[in-house]
């Protein structure tokens, strides 16, 4: 398939730049614009060197070129505070927005759990939850598809060096958004999320702990099989996703211990927390792109849809 869907990246920081490297390998996505607000940004400079068009005028600098350059998908890797306005202006032009901030104005997307359903719904904005959500919600979903989960709790530990200013600014949103997604996507009746930023040197890879309380006695064999099947699904786009220990059963509590090592595209391998976000976003966009190229989805400007 030689035709590709043109994409814009908003936010030339750690996540935006790593995502750019992944999109350049994609058989169906073609990154053509990088959008920032700081003319001295390293990310903008790097994107220019790779042949992308760039603007330091924010989304204002991109909008006049969207239709002329055929941009159909935009990735927003800025912050929760500006995402709603970015999304509104882009979807009005018929651009599908993949949200890598915790803004969560569109439905949550965790690829191995609900991506197929979202593609079928033809939404114009999907939210990639958070790094902790992408790492842990597949495990909660793997348990809840076997039997009801009344409580799901996750603890995501990331290295201080992999937590940029955007991550630090959005910590409250991280906990709220991840907790909601544990319930809405993971299937737990109640969800809770905790993030720990670890200053250890040398930096440690992302580690995640998942605890679930089931309504009834856990079916150990079925839950174990379900978790191992889900691990394989996540590894299709995040090869460094590993089950370190578990599932461990203690009465009605099921615990799973994970680590996530990045591919090392642009970010160091210990930044698995950022890598799982960019890999999930790229996977999501690829599935939408395949549907657009096959003629099964025709993106419409939101102004005309309303």
UniProtKB/Swiss-Prot annotation:
SMART domains noted in UniProt: Semialdhyde_dh (SM00859)
Domain of life, per lineage: Bacteria
Active site: 131
Gene Ontology MF terms: acetaldehyde dehydrogenase (acetylating) activity; NAD binding
Single Gene Ontology BP annotation: catabolic process
Catalytic activity, EC: 1.2.1.10
UniProt-listed CDD domains: ALDH_C
Reactions the enzyme catalyzes: acetaldehyde + NAD(+) + CoA = acetyl-CoA + NADH + H(+)
InterPro entries per the UniProt record, alphabetical: Acetaldehyde_dehydrogenase, Acetylaldehyde_DH_C, NAD(P)-bd_dom_sf, Semialdehyde_DH_NAD-bd
Residues that bind NAD(+): 162-170, 273
Tagged with keyword NAD: yes
Keywords: Aromatic hydrocarbons catabolism, NAD, Oxidoreductase
Protein family per UniProt: Belongs to the acetaldehyde dehydrogenase family.
The name this protein goes by in its record: Acetaldehyde dehydrogenase
Species of the source: Albidiferax ferrireducens (strain ATCC BAA-621 / DSM 15236 / T118) (Rhodoferax ferrireducens)
